[in-house]
């Protein structure tokens, strides 16, 4: 499981979201990265879940969608969603060369 060290708000540049709540995580390279699992959305779009990896020195970042989930999938996942989101975070982090400590 990924450990949250701190939470921070980031403005998002694509205009679809006002801000994202990001969790500050530590990786094995000794650098800090903000990882967002659930953005705060302006419009109600419950069928989308996103994961963003942000270098700690950034003040804003363009939101990157890495997966699409339907409302039915969210309902079926229930409490398992946070564990599922952790997997998405790890995959996203690995795709940009960031190794996260478990």
Q: At which residue positions do the language-model features occur?
A:
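A general, composition-driven signal for non-globular sequence regions
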Residues: 2, 13, 35-38, 62-66, ...
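Weak global preference for isoleucine
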Residues: 2, 20, 35-37, 54, ...
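Extended low-polarity, hydrophobic cluster-rich segments
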Residues: 18-26, 33-37, 81-89
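Amphipathic alpha-helical interaction modules
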Residues: 26-59
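Mixed-charge, Lys/Arg-enriched low-complexity segments
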Residues: 48-102
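Negatively charged, low-complexity tracts enriched in Asp/Glu with abundant Ser/Thr
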Residues: 1-32
């Amino acid at each position: 499981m990924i450990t949250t060290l701190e939470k921070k708000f980031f403005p998002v540049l694509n205009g679809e979201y006002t801000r994202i709540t990001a969790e500050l995580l530590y990786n094995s390279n000794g650098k800090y990265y903000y990882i967002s699992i659930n953005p705060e959305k302006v419009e109600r779009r419950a069928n989308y879940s996103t994961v963003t990896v942000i270098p700690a020195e950034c003040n804003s970042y363009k939101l990157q969608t890495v997966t699409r989930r339907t409302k039915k999938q969210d309902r079926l996942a229930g409490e398992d969603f946070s564990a599922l989101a952790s997997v998405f975070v790890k995959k996203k982090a690995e795709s940009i060369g960031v190794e996260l400590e478990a």
